Structures are given as C-alpha cells and as structure tokens.
C-alpha cells in the first residue's frame, strides 16, 4: 500500500473476475464466453485492417458501429452509446446518473454492481431474490431509488418477461431503471422496444456473450438521446477513444451478420437443454435459464466437493463462497462435445459418492 493512496482507494473491494488459465487443455466453463468462434465476417474484417487505420486515431464517435446497432435494433444512432465492453458502459452510467444516489439491485446478481456503488458513493440496497431465485418485483417498485437489474440475471440465469419490465419502469418513473442485457439473445425478451416510450430507461449490452467477442471488448447502451448525450459527456471527459479501429470494424461486422447470431444462439439453447436434462437425471436442481449458462446444485453433494472434483478432471466452473449460493455452481454452456464430456465426468463424481 502506497502512502499516496487516497482513503477511497484503500477501502475499495475490487471485482474479482473469473479465472483465465493459460492452459488450453482445460474444458473452460467458468466465464460464459460463447462456445463458438465469431462469425467469418468478423475474421474477414480483422484481416482487412490496414496500416493506415492503425496509424490514425479511430473514429471517436464510432459512427459506423452505432449505425449498425441502430439498424439492427430499429432505433436512431443518437440513441446508441458504445464503450470498451459493457462494464465500461455501465461504469460511465453509474458516474453520469447514479453517483451519490439511492440505487436498488438484487442480493444475488452481477458482482460489479456493489463495486461501482462503493466507487461512486451510491446508497445501495440489495433486495433479496425469492427462494427460487426469481426477482421480487414488488420490492423493486420504489420511486425513491434507481434500479439496476441484470436480465437475464447472473449467476441465476432467470429472466423477467417484458411486461414485468414495463411494470418496473412504470412504477419508478422519476428514477432511472437500468436493464443490463449482457446475456441477451439466448431466450429472454429484450427491453429495447420500451426505450422509445420511457425517458428513465437504459438498456446495456455486451458483444462478449452473444457474438463471441469477449476478447475484443465491445459493449453498448440504448436509451433516449438525452441520456446518451450525458454518457458521451462523461466518456469524453475520460477517454474520447475507448474503441480502437480494430474493435469498431470487427464489431460492426458482427452486428451486421444477423444470420450467424440466430444460428449461434440456437446452438447454445440446444446444448443448454442437453446439459439440463442430463444433470437433472443425476439429481441436480437446474434453474430455468435464459442465458448461456446454467445454475445448478446437487440434492446431496456439496458444491465445493463437485467444484474441486471437476477441477481435478480439468473442467472449470464458477463457484462463490457467499452463504446463500455456496452449494450452487454456475456452468457455462459449451460445445456439444464439451457438454457430453461434462456429463460423463459428473456421472462419475455422483456415482463415486453414492456407492
């Protein structure tokens, strides 16, 4: 600890990302990367990057990318904000609109929310999810506080239907409602069509999960133009060039390839169902998921035992020590071959403990 640290820095509890091992022999089901490589159009765009593009600064407005997103979502480019992953987009959002404000989120959700709340001095209330990990919607209907809600939620995978999002936004008309759709495209209804009617709604997204671009770091927000203008003011007060030319070109190609997105998302849904069916047959409870992962616990075996046993067999999943979910594991949806290998290993683990 340096003597130059501010008290704020000393008191931070930073977010801890999932493990990224160097080995390529592991079956990596712990950080929810897409199971498939990105679209061929993305790889073509990367190959076509020129030295001149790298010599010059990138477009600070990312106009081509924003226009592609706007066309895909039937909104105006003025309603699109882009950043270096949805984490940066959300961080700017907290700074622009939630700093020092009362904010509600869930007690079992994305671990970065309390980090940003502490960083930006927000008064955070963590509303408990219900016994089945569904959202207590009535508890969030509070016009005294903004709401930040992951939908689908992580790590549970559960999602609210659009009509319940409408009810939430309607009941919090004088406070901002942020719907974090990092896991869009895998079955949940999107809140994007609601943006036109609500000046208190922001929808954020990542290309890491849906488009297989976790290594590229691209995210965006959709909201009415006045909110987007506020985000741009904050962005340009930190870094006018958050997205480099390579990221802008590749992300644009990804957004424009709707056929790849639909086919890849269906593949995830198909493998997810195979994993769910196979694990339930072994005595696992598997929560309903609208994401590219499942949240599971066994009816007799402790979560840490399963986690350690999987790791000893070169399969990584995600586990937390938090009391409420310590026996639960979050398992990313992999390829069909990875899913089949997971089921074989899980069967061995369960069988060894029941002999």
Model-derived features: where do they sit?
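PLP-dependent aminotransferase-like
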Residues: 96-150
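Short acidic capping loops at alpha-helix termini that bridge into adjacent secondary structure
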Residues: 76-80, 101-102, 181, 199-200, ...
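Active-site pre-lysine segment of PLP-dependent enzymes
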Residues: 134-143, 155-177, 181-213, 225-227
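Conserved PLP-binding catalytic core of the aspartate aminotransferase-like
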Residues: 268-269, 280-313, 329
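N-terminal "arm"/small-domain region of PLP-dependent enzymes with the aminotransferase-like
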Residues: 1-56, 143
């Amino acid at each position: 600890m340096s003597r130059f640290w501010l008290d704020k820095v000393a008191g931070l509890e930073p977010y801890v990302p999932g493990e990224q091992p160097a080995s390529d022999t592991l079956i990596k089901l712990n950080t929810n990367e897409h199971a498939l490589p990105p679209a061929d159009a993305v790889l073509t765009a990367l190959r076509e990057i020129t030295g001149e593009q790298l010599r010059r600064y990138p477009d600070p407005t990312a106009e081509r990318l924003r226009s592609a997103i706007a066309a895909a979502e039937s909104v105006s480019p003025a309603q699109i904000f882009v950043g270096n992953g949805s984490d940066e987009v959300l961080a700017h959002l907290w700074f622009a609109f939630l700093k020092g404000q009362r904010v509600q989120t869930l007690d079992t959700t994305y671990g970065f929310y309390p980090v940003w709340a502490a960083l930006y001095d927000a008064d955070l209330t963590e509303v408990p999810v219900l016994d089945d990990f569904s959202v207590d919607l009535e508890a969030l209907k509070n016009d005294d506080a903004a709401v930040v809600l992951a939908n689908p939620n992580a790590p549970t995978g559960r999602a609210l239907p659009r009509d319940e999002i409408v009810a939430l936004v309607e009941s919090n008309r004088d406070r901002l409602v942020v719907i974090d759709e990092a896991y869009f495209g895998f079955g949940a209804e999107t809140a994007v069509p609601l943006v036109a009617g609500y000046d208190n709604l922001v929808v954020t997204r990542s290309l890491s999960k849906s488009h297989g671009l976790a290594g590229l770091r691209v995210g965006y927000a959709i909201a009415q133009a006045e909110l987007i203008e506020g985000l741009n003011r904050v962005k340009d007060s930190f870094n006018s060039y958050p997205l480099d030319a390579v990221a802008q070109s590749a992300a644009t190609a990804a957004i424009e390839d709707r056929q790849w997105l639909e086919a890849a998302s269906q593949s995830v849904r198909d493998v997810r169902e195979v994993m769910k069916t196979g694990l339930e047959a072994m005595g696992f409870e598997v929560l309903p998921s609208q994401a590219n992962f499942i949240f599971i616990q066994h009816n007799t075996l402790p979560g840490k035992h399963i986690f350690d046993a999987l790791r000893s067999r070169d399969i990584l999943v995600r586990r937390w020590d938090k009391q409420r979910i310590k026996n639960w594991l979050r398992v990313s949806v992999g390829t069909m071959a990875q899913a089949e290998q997971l089921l074989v290993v899980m069967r061995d683990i369960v069988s060894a403990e029941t002999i």
